[in-house]
Amino acid sequence: MQERINNCVTQVLAESAGTRGEGAYLIDIKVKGKGSGRKIEILMDADDGIRIHQCAYISRRVRERIEGDDDLLELVGENFDLMVSSPGLGEPIIIPRQYIRHVGKLLQVTYADSNGDPVELVGHLQEVSLLDEHGAKIVIMPEQKKKKGQQPKTEAVILYLNQVIRAIPEAEL
């Protein structure tokens, strides 16, 4: 069923050029519950941040497709709930494309060092390269606390995404 819903969302996104849904991309789909009370949660984003009108547009189009497909509607149940939303602050980055919208922002990153041990890093995302010859990578400028009378010494940290265990956007005060 999840694959069928995924196909449904993919079709809606493919047809969204020039519409209110343009620019949005799929992050994740979760189907919860059983029988006629299922809840479908669709997580979306856009490179410049998804807007409410984009979520509403996609929600309407996906609902129309599900309700127009008798087989899928039977699987989902007629009383299904559909929620289309964006990842909230503090939610981990799931797919590489999400890094693009967080350039310049503070991230809390856990990555595996050369020994495979987890390392925590908090810093500003400086650069994203999804098409590097060695694999997708990010560049983080670590945040360092200033010591009185001294300039902090910082060097950018380059991480390939296969090293990243978890990355969470942080609020800046």
Swiss-Prot record:
Encoding gene, per UniProt annotation: rimP
Matching Gene3D superfamilies: RimP-like superfamily, N-terminal
UniProt keywords, alphabetically: Cytoplasm, Ribosome biogenesis
Keyword Cytoplasm: yes
Signal sequence, renumbered to the chain: none
Record protein name field: Ribosome maturation factor RimP
The family this protein is said to belong to: Belongs to the RimP family.
Organism: Pelodictyon phaeoclathratiforme (strain DSM 5477 / BU-1)
Domain of life the protein comes from: Bacteria
One GO CC annotation: cytoplasm
HAMAP family registered for this protein in UniProt: RimP (MF_01077)
SUPFAM superfamilies, sorted: YhbC-like, N-terminal domain
Subcellular location: Cytoplasm
InterPro entries, sorted: Ribosome_maturation_RimP, RimP_N, RimP_N_sf
Biological role: Required for maturation of 30S ribosomal subunits.
Gene Ontology BP terms: ribosomal small subunit biogenesis
Primary localization: cytoplasm
